[in-house]
C-alpha cells in the first residue's frame, strides 16, 4: 500500500511554551508542604527534606522513567538487549512565600527557577502535623494555592510593563512597523493579564502569531499546572479529606480542565522503604495503590509530550515527541538522516500488535499502515521508518 498523500493529518492546536522535548516540570508550593519528600520518592533520590523553610535553595533535578504497560509488554515480547523508556524531567524548587515577586524569602531566585521550567506540579498540603511547621501558621490549602497563583500572576504583571514600554518606544514613537504587530499583541496580553487579572493559559484562542510572542517571553502563568494534594497516610487510604472537595471546586472554577491528584508523601516514603513483596502485601491489605505512576503520566501529558515506539530484539525504545508531530520530524528524533531522506512510516497501533500477536499477523489483518509525510504520529504508535540515505559528495 503506497503512503497516503497530503491531507491525512489534522492541524494540531498551537502550544504555548518552549519547543523541543527536553522539557521540565517544576515542583512548586509553599515551604514545608512536602515538596522535597515528594521529589525524593518520585526520583528515589535523597534531596534534603528538613523541617524549615528554604531547605531547598538550588533546584534539584532528576529524570524519572514514565511507567507504561505498553513499553513493558513490548520488552516482554521482544526480550531486547536494550530497553529505553520515556523520561520526565522533574525539578524540585524551593518554597515560595507571600511577597516572593517583591523578593520576599528567596523570591526572585525561586521565580527564575520556575521560569526555567515548562510546567508546574503545584503541591499543596492538606494534612495536620504539629511536628511540621506551616509558614502561614495553619493548614489551609485553598489559601496556599491562592498565594502561589497570586505570586505568579504578579510576577507576570511586573514583566509586562517593561516589555510594553520598550515596544512602544520603538514601534509606536519610533515608527518601526515590523514591531507594531508585537506591540499590539502585548497590549492584548496586558488587557488579559493585568486588566482582567487572568493567567495567560486561561485564554484558549491565542492565534499562531500571538503564540510566537508568548513563547518569546515565557510568562509564568502560561505554564500548565497539575495540582498535587499531599494527604496523611490515613486520609489517602480511606479516600477522605475535608479539603479535597473544596480544592477540586476551586480548581474547576479558577483553573478549569486542570487535574487534581491526591497522594500521600508519608505513604510513598513508607512504600519505598519496604521490599517489593512487603510493599505488595501492604497495598493489598489496605486496598490502596501508589499515586506516583498517575502523577508522572499527568506531568508528561501536561507538557504536551507523547512518544512512539521502535521495537525489536536489539532494542525497545520510547521516543519522546511533542503532540502534533508529523512523521518526518518524528523520524528525525532517531537520526537527522531519517528526516532528510524520509520516504514513509510503516505504522502499527500498539493495540493491534497486542491483539494480533505479531507483526505478520497485523499485516495479514490489514492493520499495518504506510503513512506519508503529513501523518501526525499518535501516542503509542509502533513505527518503522523507510528513508533514502543522503548521498555523499563525490570526490574530484
Curated annotation (Swiss-Prot):
Motif Nuclear export signal positions after renumbering to this chain: 267-274
Entry coiled-coil feature ranges: none
Gene3D superfamilies named among the record's database cross-references: 3.10.20.30, P-loop containing nucleotide triphosphate hydrolases, TGS-like domain
UniProt xrefs under InterPro entries: ATPase_YchF/OLA1, Beta-grasp_dom_sf, G_OBG, GTP-bd, P-loop_NTPase, TGS, TGS-like, TGS-like_dom_sf
Pfam families: MMR_HSR1, YchF-GTPase_C
GO CC aspect terms: centrosome; cytosol; nucleolus
Residues bound to Mg(2+): 36, 56
Compartments, record wording: Cytoplasm; Nucleus; Nucleus, Nucleolus
Modified residue annotations for N6-acetyllysine: 294
Cofactor (UniProt): Mg(2+)
Residues that bind ATP: 32-37, 231
GO MF entry, a single one: metal ion binding
Role noted for this protein: Hydrolyzes ATP, and can also hydrolyze GTP with lower efficiency. Has lower affinity for GTP.
Family designation: Belongs to the TRAFAC class OBG-HflX-like GTPase superfamily. OBG GTPase family. YchF/OLA1 subfamily.
Protein name in the entry: Obg-like ATPase 1
Naturally occurring in which organism (per UniProt): Mus musculus
Amino acid at each position: 500500500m503506497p503512503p497516503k498523500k497530503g491531507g491525512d493529518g489534522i492541524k494540531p492546536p498551537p502550544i504555548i511554551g518552549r519547543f523541543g522535548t527536553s522539557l521540565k516540570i517544576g515542583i512548586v508550593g509553599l515551604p514545608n508542604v512536602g515538596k522535597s519528600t515528594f521529589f525524593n520518592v518520585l526520583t528515589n533520590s535523597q534531596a534534603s527534606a528538613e523541617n524549615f523553610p528554604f531547605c531547598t535553595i538550588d533546584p534539584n533535578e532528576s529524570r524519572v522513567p514514565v511507567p507504561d504497560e505498553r513499553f513493558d509488554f513490548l520488552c516482554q515480547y521482544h526480550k531486547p538487549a536494550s530497553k529505553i523508556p520515556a523520561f520526565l524531567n522533574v525539578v524540585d524548587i524551593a518554597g515560595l512565600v507571600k511577597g516572593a515577586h517583591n523578593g520576599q524569602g528567596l523570591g526572585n531566585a525561586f521565580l527564575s527557577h520556575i521560569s526555567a521550567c515548562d510546567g508546574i506540579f503545584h503541591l499543596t498540603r492538606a494534612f495536620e502535623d504539629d511536628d511540621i511547621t506551616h509558614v502561614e501558621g495553619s493548614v489551609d490549602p485553598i489559601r496556599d494555592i491562592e498565594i502561589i497563583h497570586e505570586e505568579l500572576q504578579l510576577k507576570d504583571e511586573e514583566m509586562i510593563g517593561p516589555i510594553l514600554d520598550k515596544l512602544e518606544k520603538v514601534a509606536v514613537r519610533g515608527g518601526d512597523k515590523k514591531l507594531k504587530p508585537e506591540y499590539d499583541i502585548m497590549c492584548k496580553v496586558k488587557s488579559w493579564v493585568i486588566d482582567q487579572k487572568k493567567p495567560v493559559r486561561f485564554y484558549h484562542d491565542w492565534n499562531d502569531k500571538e503564540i510566537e510572542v508568548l513563547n518569546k517571553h515565557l510568562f509564568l502563568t502560561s505554564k500548565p499546572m497539575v495540582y498535587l494534594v499531599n494527604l496523611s497516610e490515613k486520609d489517602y487510604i480511606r479516600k477522605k479529606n475535608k479539603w479535597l472537595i473544596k480544592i477540586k471546586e476551586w480548581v474547576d472554577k479558577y483553573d478549569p480542565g486542570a487535574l487534581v491528584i491526591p497522594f500521600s508523601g508519608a505513604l510513598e516514603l513508607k512504600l519505598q522503604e519496604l521490599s517489593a513483596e512487603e510493599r505488595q502485601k501492604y497495598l493489598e491489605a489496605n486496598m490502596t495503590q501508589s499515586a506516583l505512576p498517575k502523577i508522572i503520566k499527568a506531568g508528561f501529558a501536561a507538557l504536551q509530550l507523547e512518544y512512539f515506539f521502535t521495537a525489536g530484539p536489539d532494542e525497545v525504545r520510547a521516543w519522546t515527541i511533542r503532540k502534533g508531530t508529523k512523521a518526518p520530524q518524528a523520524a528525525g528524533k532517531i537520526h537527522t538522516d531519517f528526516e532528510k531522506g524520509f520516504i514513509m512510516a510503516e505504522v502499527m497501533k500498539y493495540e493491534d500488535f497486542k491483539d494480533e500477536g505479531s507483526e505478520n499477523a497485523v499485516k495479514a489483518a490489514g492493520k499495518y499502515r504506510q503513512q506519508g509525510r503529513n501523518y501526525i504520529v499518535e501516542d503509542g504508535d509502533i513505527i518503522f521508518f523507510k528513508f533514502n540515505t543522503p548521498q555523499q559528495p563525490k570526490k574530484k
